[in-house]
């Protein structure tokens, strides 16, 4: 044996080693491509919701699970407060705390914040591995490797899993695909073991994200379609009954879920299909014992009776309130106009808006075109598993169109079906590729019916390689430029191309933390509640949980009212400071003026705010303007005055008058005014955050001080 004889592996071992190497590279790529934000800025938590998750995780790591589960947070929703343990999905926090304690057990010292920052990239690597195994079950290892490489860099998934994006979706997509993989294994084998593993994966999913409802409706739908197509078998019966029974019992252990799996409308489809499975099994048993004529009579009688009983019982339970109706968010998925017409608090969230056509190309690129190819392959070679992935693809496509947030659910199946499609195209043309030299081929060896077969195959393979390369470059660019900027720290390009950093948010929160009393109550719009509580450690009135529409409406009424009426509301709520976000100086478009109409709509959606009419804030021609042509109601409301106080003296651009708003591209209409019930406490360097102190009540005969 030569010195390098150990490298002489069998074909099977070389194949396994190559697969392992490619999959490992995809997992490493998945982790590393999500680190742009850390390299460009620092290890920092992004967005809004992740700050609440970080705060609760830190409490869990320091105080333990018992105190965490029974934690009453008096810093949120003043004066109501919030019970934390029973109002969250704890999977994310428990996962981070477990990793933190395991690392410390091995004397690897790491701050809990860094665990939170890097958790989503870590789980994206796990997602890559699960995607490989799932796609392999649907076609082969080649398709699995392609799908794994695609999901490693797909922008639709990266948008919620970059370093610092510490949200439920960071681990939920892994849980979802793991549940699907276990389900397909259970369906293929009919094994109770695989079905039990599927139920455990489903339990992890339930503990992590409210999107578990999609799973518990998709799996029963799959079973129902298998029944209708005559594919139902003992394997499906064992798999579904085990998953449903065990999964339902486990899911009910999550406090936030409780008895919903047996009481809410969202879970009734799963229960109904479970009942159908029992009826189907009973019918099969009767068919084996009766002759065809007897069976036909009995079957029709039983089906009619059972259907009538189920409809009657279901209607009675719905009417008596024993089965709760669908929630607003789920109604919005079935009727996209529902939230806009009935629940403005849901419609006001940007991620609940319908998806634009451009978003599909931006977040998926090549996958948009290869998805139908994979779908066609699955339809052409139907199996129980491929029927499931077809249903997953079609349903997630619809839901992603209704709500842009659900692009996250669509991205994995786009990668899976595109991986299958690309693999099938490459396999087809690879067979036609002849790598032998043309001058050595005899005329007999050449196919007279297809003389340019080799050239066509080579061209198609080169075209596919080109598209895959452009997909990689596009995904990397989108990740770097669009999805790697933490909202807590903003950046822009200067005239010379240099990067300018705006750190006003943290500047304002630290000012609040060090310059206000510990018991100070801060009023702001609900978007910033989690950040204020986590970074400023001050009590807030409303936050991103949005569980009490009446309380949020009261804040909206204060923002939309005149100073005098707003002062009454602020005294009622015991407000000490008011915080607003203003982008007129820097050009930051996601400020409170641009969100103001949602405050008006939500403020006027309750009985106490019936006097607030959205039309009052428009001009007679129906425009929302902040200049002299703007509505007098708008120009004199509290939000307008807090944002534009002293702004009329500021020059924002050359050759523009003072008080020129760079977001609205207009000179403000109300410049010369003073505040009666508030006093300016702090304005950040770039005027992005403005904080006002609420004046005390008048002394008799004296003005407010």
UniProtKB/Swiss-Prot annotation:
Q: Where does dolichyl diphosphooligosaccharide bind?
A: 405, 530
Q: Tell me which UniProt keywords the record has, alphabetically.
A: Congenital disorder of glycosylation, Disease variant, Endoplasmic reticulum, Glycoprotein, Glycosyltransferase, Magnesium, Manganese, Membrane, Metal-binding, Transferase, Transmembrane, Transmembrane helix
Q: Which family does it belong to?
A: Belongs to the STT3 family.
InterPro entries with a match to the protein in the record: AglB-like_core (IPR054479), Oligo_trans_STT3 (IPR003674), STT3_N (IPR048307)
**What disorder does this protein's entry note?**
Congenital disorder of glycosylation 1W, autosomal recessive: A form of congenital disorder of glycosylation, a multisystem disorder caused by a defect in glycoprotein biosynthesis and characterized by under-glycosylated serum glycoproteins. Congenital disorders of glycosylation result in a wide variety of clinical features, such as defects in the nervous system development, psychomotor retardation, dysmorphic features, hypotonia, coagulation disorders, and immunodeficiency. Congenital disorder of glycosylation 1W, autosomal dominant: A form of congenital disorder of glycosylation, a multisystem disorder caused by a defect in glycoprotein biosynthesis and characterized by under-glycosylated serum glycoproteins. Congenital disorders of glycosylation result in a wide variety of clinical features, such as defects in the nervous system development, psychomotor retardation, dysmorphic features, hypotonia, coagulation disorders, and immunodeficiency.
| Glycosylated residues (UniProt) | 537, 544, 548
State the pathway, as annotated in the record. Answer: Protein modification; protein glycosylation
Q: What is known of its domains?
A: Despite low primary sequence conservation between eukaryotic catalytic subunits and bacterial and archaeal single subunit OSTs (ssOST), structural comparison revealed several common motifs at spatially equivalent positions, like the DXD motif 1 on the external loop 1 and the DXD motif 2 on the external loop 2 involved in binding of the metal ion cofactor and the carboxamide group of the acceptor asparagine, the conserved Glu residue of the TIXE/SVSE motif on the external loop 5 involved in catalysis, as well as the WWDYG and the DK/MI motifs in the globular domain that define the binding pocket for the +2 Ser/Thr of the acceptor sequon.
Kindly report every residue range on the membrane side named Cytoplasmic.
Answer: 1-17, 139-140, 190-191, 229-233, 288-300, 380-385, 429-453
What residues correspond to the site Important for catalytic activity? 160
Its gene name is: STT3A
Q: What does this protein do?
A: Catalytic subunit of the oligosaccharyl transferase (OST) complex that catalyzes the initial transfer of a defined glycan (Glc(3)Man(9)GlcNAc(2) in eukaryotes) from the lipid carrier dolichol-pyrophosphate to an asparagine residue within an Asn-X-Ser/Thr consensus motif in nascent polypeptide chains, the first step in protein N-glycosylation. N-glycosylation occurs cotranslationally and the complex associates with the Sec61 complex at the channel-forming translocon complex that mediates protein translocation across the endoplasmic reticulum (ER).
Q: What does it catalyze?
A: a di-trans,poly-cis-dolichyl diphosphooligosaccharide + L-asparaginyl-[protein] = N(4)-(oligosaccharide-(1->4)-N-acetyl-beta-D-glucosaminyl-(1->4)-N-acetyl-beta-D-glucosaminyl)-L-asparaginyl-[protein] + a di-trans,poly-cis-dolichyl diphosphate + H(+)
- What Pfam family is a match, any one? AglB_core-like
Report the superkingdom from the record.
Eukaryota
Tissue specificity: Expressed at high levels in placenta, liver, muscle and pancreas, and at very low levels in brain, lung and kidney. Expressed in skin fibroblasts (at protein level).
What name appears for this protein in its UniProt entry?
Dolichyl-diphosphooligosaccharide--protein glycosyltransferase subunit STT3A
GO CC terms of this entry: endoplasmic reticulum membrane; membrane; oligosaccharyltransferase complex; oligosaccharyltransferase complex A
Asked if the keyword ATP-binding belongs to this entry, the reply reads no
Q: Where's the motif SVSE motif?
A: 348-351
Region described as Interacts with target acceptor peptide in protein substrate: spans on this chain:
525-527
Q: Where is this motif: WWDYG motif?
A: 525-529
Q: For site (Interacts with target acceptor peptide in protein substrate), what residue positions does UniProt give?
A: 49, 351, 595
């Amino acid at each position: 044996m030569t010195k390098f004889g150990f490298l002489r592996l069998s074909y099977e071992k070389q194949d396994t080693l190559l697969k392992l190497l490619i999959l490992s590279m995809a997992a490493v790529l998945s982790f590393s491509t999500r680190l742009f934000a850390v390299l460009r800025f620092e290890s920092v938590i992004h967005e809004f919701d992740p700050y609440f998750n970080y705060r609760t995780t830190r409490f869990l790591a320091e105080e333990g699970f018992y105190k965490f589960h029974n934690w009453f947070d008096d810093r949120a929703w003043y004066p109501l407060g919030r019970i934390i343990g029973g109002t969250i999905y704890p999977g994310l926090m428990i996962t981070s705390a477990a990793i933190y304690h395991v690392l410390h057990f091995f004397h690897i010292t790491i701050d809990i914040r860094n665990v939170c920052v890097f958790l989503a990239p870590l789980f994206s690597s796990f997602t890559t591995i699960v995607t490989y195994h799932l796609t392999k079950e649907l076609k082969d290892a080649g398709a699995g490797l392609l799908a794994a490489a695609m999901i490693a860099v797909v922008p639709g998934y990266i948008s919620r899993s970059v370093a610092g994006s510490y949200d439920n979706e960071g681990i939920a997509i892994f849980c979802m695909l793991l549940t699907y993989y276990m389900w397909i294994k259970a369906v293929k084998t009919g094994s109770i073991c695989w079905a039990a593993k599927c139920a455990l994966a489903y339990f992890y999913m339930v503990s992590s994200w409210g999107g578990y409802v999609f799973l518990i409706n998709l799996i029963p739908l799959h079973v129902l379609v298998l029944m209708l197509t005559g594919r139902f078998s003992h394997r499906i019966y064992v798999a579904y009954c085990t998953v449903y029974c065990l999964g339902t019992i486990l899911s009910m252990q999550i406090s936030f879920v409780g008895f919903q799996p047996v009481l809410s409308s969202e879970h009734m489809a799963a229960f109904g299909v479970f009942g159908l499975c029992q009826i189907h099994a009973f019918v099969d048993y009767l068919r084996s014992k009766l002759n065809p004529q007897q069976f036909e009579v009995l079957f029709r009688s039983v089906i009619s009776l059972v259907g009538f009983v189920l409809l009657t019982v279901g209607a009675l339970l719905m009417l008596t309130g024993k089965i709760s109706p669908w929630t607003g968010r789920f109604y919005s998925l079935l009727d996209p106009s529902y939230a806009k017409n009935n629940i403005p608090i849901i419609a006001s969230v940007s991620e609940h808006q319908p998806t634009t056509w451009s978003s599909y190309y931006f977040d998926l690129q090549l996958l948009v075109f290869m998805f139908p190819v994979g779908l066609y392959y699955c339809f052409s070679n139907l199996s129980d598993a491929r029927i499931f992935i077809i249903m997953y693809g079609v349903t997630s496509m619809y839901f992603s169109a209704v709500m842009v947030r659900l692009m996250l659910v669509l991205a994995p199946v786009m990668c899976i079906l595109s991986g299958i499609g690309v693999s099938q195209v490459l396999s087809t043309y690879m067979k036609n590729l002849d790598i032998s030299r043309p001058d050595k081929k005899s005329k007999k060896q050449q196919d007279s019916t297809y003389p340019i077969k080799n050239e066509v195959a080579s061209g198609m393979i080169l075209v596919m390689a080109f598209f895959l390369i452009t997909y990689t470059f596009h995904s990397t660019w989108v990740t770097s430029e669009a999805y790697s900027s933490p909202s807590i720290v903003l950046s822009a390009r200067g005239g010379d191309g240099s990067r300018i950093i705006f750190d006003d948010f943290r500047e304002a929160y630290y000012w609040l933390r060090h310059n206000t009393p510990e018991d100070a109550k801060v009023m702001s719009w609900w978007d910033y509640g989690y950040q204020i509580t986590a970074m400023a450690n001050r009590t807030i009135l409303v936050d991103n949980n949005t569980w009490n529409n009446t309380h949020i409406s009261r804040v909206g009424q204060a923002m939309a009212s005149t100073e005098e009426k707003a002062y009454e509301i602020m005294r009622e709520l015991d407000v000490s400071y008011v915080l607003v976000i203003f982008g007129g100086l820097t050009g930051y478009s996601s400020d409170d003026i641009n969100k103001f109409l949602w405050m008006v709509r939500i403020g006027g959606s309750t009985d106490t705010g019936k006097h607030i009419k959205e039309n009052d804030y428009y001009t007679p021609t129906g425009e929302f303007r902040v200049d002299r042509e703007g509505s007098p109601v708008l120009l004199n409301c509290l939000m307008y005055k807090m944002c534009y106080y002293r702004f009329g003296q500021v020059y924002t651009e050359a050759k523009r008058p003072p008080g020129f708003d760079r977001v609205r591209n207009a000179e403000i209409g109300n410049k010369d005014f003073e505040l009666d019930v508030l006093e300016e406490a702090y304005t950040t360097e770039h005027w992005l955050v403005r904080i006002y102190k609420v004046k005390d009540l008048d002394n008799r005969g004296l003005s407010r001080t």
